[in-house]
Amino acid sequence: MLEKKLSIKKTVSRFIENWVDEIADPFTSWLFQSVLHWNVIILVADGTFNEYEISFEDICLKINTRVGSRTSIQNIIKVGIAKGYFVKTASRSDNRRKVLHLSENGKKSFSEFLIRDEKTYVYE
């Protein structure tokens, strides 16, 4: 059986074709707003799907300060909560520490994004 290779040409074309849909979707429009948005959302999603706790402080430690400031990270988190994509809860190990997770809507939106993204890649 021959191994299929990624068709860069067709994949790039599909990325461009998908722009309109991504901008129309509230979640992906927010996800792609900036590199910092992408980083924060991916870190919260990783914590959610891999079942570990991640706090604002953890996120700040993982993201280079050249990508975004603590204030910008905090603002993205606040917007994520307001949009219903994130929830903030007390840590299981320390009630003073607040941790972030994707809400049910956030999990659904993120999963739908990944499924659509997977279809973008063309192998021949």
Place the predicted regions along the sequence by residue:
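Amphipathic alpha-helical dimerization/coiled-coil segments
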Residues: 111-124
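Short acidic, hydrophobic short linear motifs in intrinsically disordered regions
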Residues: 50-63
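Short alpha-helical segments that sit at the start of domains
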Residues: 13-45
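Short amphipathic alpha-helical interaction segments
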Residues: 66-82
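Phosphate-/nucleic-acid-contacting segments
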Residues: 59, 66-69, 91-96
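Short, cationic-aromatic polyanion-contact patches
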Residues: 91-114
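A short, conserved structural fragment
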Residues: 81-91
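An acidic intrinsically disordered interaction segment
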Residues: 1-14, 109
